[in-house]
Amino acid sequence: MSEPIFDRTMAFAGILQAIGQVQKVARHGQADDEMLGACLGTIMVTNPDSTADVYQDKVALNRGYQLVLNQLGDDKQKDVEVTRYLIGILALERKLSRSSNAMGMLAERINQVHRQLHHFAITDEQVVANFAGIYSDIISTLGPKIQISGNPEYLKQPMVQHKIRALLLAAMRSAVLWRQLGGKRRHLVFSRKTIVDTAKKSLTL
């Protein structure tokens, strides 16, 4: 199970899992608390012994695997919005990985959240706002902002904005891991079948 392709596909599913929740919040104004918690929890696992340590909620990750099948499979379920968010996240991740200053600030701010979690649940509004602040201060300054589509009435609400930014930070965490595990954008074109087959196997494990 610790084969590189399984680990890479797990991290890629983690990106899409978070992006799927971004869409849900942007369109409906709220996220499933368990899914939100699962996504945000990945940010806090900074020194994992294995990739599976990062994604401890298998049910939540299965939604990510399903999106892998939808986006890279041969059926007609591809979502151009998901693709656009994915491209934006991967572009920002490249800039992040090249900036030791940004990476250092990110680690420092995540440590602050660790302390906050002694007093609050990870889905508490104050914690979510903190994650959102990390994304705004460190990630979104690295390059073009990701334009989020959704219901304008919800997108105006500060808590909705916080959840979306917090989930984008979770997507970024998985993108960093995916790259560390050898993931490259060209794999999404030339190794599509392998990734899809691996996602299918992972869904049944």
UniProtKB/Swiss-Prot annotation:
Signal peptide: none annotated. The keyword Cytoplasm applies. The keyword Ribosomal protein does not apply. SUPFAM superfamilies: YcfC-like. GO terms for cellular component: cytoplasm; plasma membrane. Keywords: Cell inner membrane, Cell membrane, Cytoplasm, Membrane. NCBIfam families: PRK00218.1-2 (NF001246), PRK00218.1-4 (NF001248). Belongs to the HflD family. This is High frequency lysogenization protein HflD homolog. It comes from Shewanella loihica (strain ATCC BAA-1088 / PV-4).
